[in-house]
Amino acid sequence: MDQLLDVETLKKLSPEQQEQVISGVKQQAALANAQNLVTDISEKCTNKCITAPGSSLASGEKQCLQRCMDRFMESWNLVSQTLQKRLQEEMASSGGMGGGFGQGPSFS
């Protein structure tokens, strides 16, 4: 299943095949999120904390980087938990996916 699948093709797959596709999409999304997180932390914290590039980090720069990364991760986790809770609430109120692909909850 290396080719692109449209919604109609996905609907024709067996439940096991649908689960494989969904699992693959979830894994790719998780990987992309992790890569974005690392990139964002690196860019934001480096720009904020390292004022003068050199061969080593000053003590204050190390502390700043640690605090920056900690705050960034706390914020990321809070947003992720809030979004996950909202998604679960919307799915529960709409009765789940409701009949197939492309009919998930709206985030408006």
UniProtKB/Swiss-Prot annotation:
It comes from the Eukaryota. It is a peripheral membrane protein. Keywords: Chaperone, Disulfide bond, Membrane, Metal-binding, Mitochondrion, Mitochondrion inner membrane, Protein transport, Translocation, Transport, Zinc. Residues 95-108 have a biased composition (Gly residues). InterPro entries: Tim10-like, Tim10-like_dom_sf. One of its GO terms (biological process) is protein insertion into mitochondrial inner membrane. Pfam families: zf-Tim10_DDP. It is found in: Mitochondrion inner membrane. One of its GO terms (molecular function) is metal ion binding. Belongs to the small Tim family. The twin CX3C motif contains 4 conserved Cys residues that form 2 disulfide bonds in the mitochondrial intermembrane space. However, during the transit of tin-13/tim-13 from cytoplasm into mitochondrion, the Cys residues probably coordinate zinc, thereby preventing folding and allowing its transfer across mitochondrial outer membrane. Heterohexamer; composed of 3 copies of tim-8/ddp-1 and 3 copies of tin-13/tim-13, named soluble 70 kDa complex. Associates with the TIM22 complex, whose core is composed of tim-22. This is Mitochondrial import inner membrane translocase subunit tim-13. The lineage of its organism: Eukaryota, Metazoa, Ecdysozoa, Nematoda, Chromadorea. The gene is tin-13.
